[in-house]
């Protein structure tokens, strides 16, 4: 038994923890949970816990349904919202076959596999997400437009605002769980908020994002309001994204930094960026996986609709921040295409793999875009070689299903299930008769 397992067992006993929740996600990024009693924890570390894998989206086929959930003791934390004298803890888990092999449908394993390839090349992949979400008043009929809890705007200080208190409570709870937060503030939309997690390796950050979503939902329930990570909940307000800052380190050195080069970008950084732009359309269905995601991408308000990069250009898909231009360890690039309901394990897998492919293939990064890409004409964008991202889930899926690259990164099992599920979602959406159609056409047609 290793020290992390011993720590978890000792803490459970000393803190009188009565339930240990074992967390994992399905292929779509939905959190799954099973609770075990303290008496079962040691056996769970040694042998795992059996479950029906076919009952979880994309995990396995019915004919191969016996699977094992194996807790990762390094992720052990007490859940603050389940406090009291008899508390609850949680751990993230890896999914294994009865033979002890990683499940092909486990998103956490997909990311571990991508990180292992980076490690073989001497790289550690760090990410830093800026997570946006809306706070609405509770309502019973969600077919009607939601009501934001305030009318604040970007960086607004709203005295005695429920949103300000909400952010404070969220940050405090995250830090109780060992999740460091850099910033929190009101965003541009009414009732829209942003909380930025401190950078960490991609696997830790993906786990933290799943915890973050749960914390936000728990606090909203306690306070009688509704928190939503929906990418575009309001037609006339900015959508919610999850802009993510990316960096590669070689040991203690930032591989993206080279003093004296344009924007202090090393050749490694330029090739990594070129790889992401090269594969951007192929991976779009993974980074933006819902029908609603494309209403954010194509809704303006600094959303990135076109495949380009720029220095301090928030209309670009990939931005090179220059907050601290002379500080090597701060060198990074910001991918602005992600939304907050992406499966973080799969999203970070395809982003890392795309960047590494750029390095392996020695791809050349084109010229940066300084213009607001939305203000350019189609002819101007074409002359500059700027291509659009897919404008719908359907368009994104048609590109992804032809991609050997994405199939290789996700693995055929997860790749095929993801496509099948998302094609079904598009078919369901396409078959709807919307309120817009009824209002516009029914009276006169």
Q: What annotation goes with each model-predicted range?
A:
Residues 1-445:
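Glycine-rich, acidic/polar active-site loops that bind/position phosphate-bearing ligands
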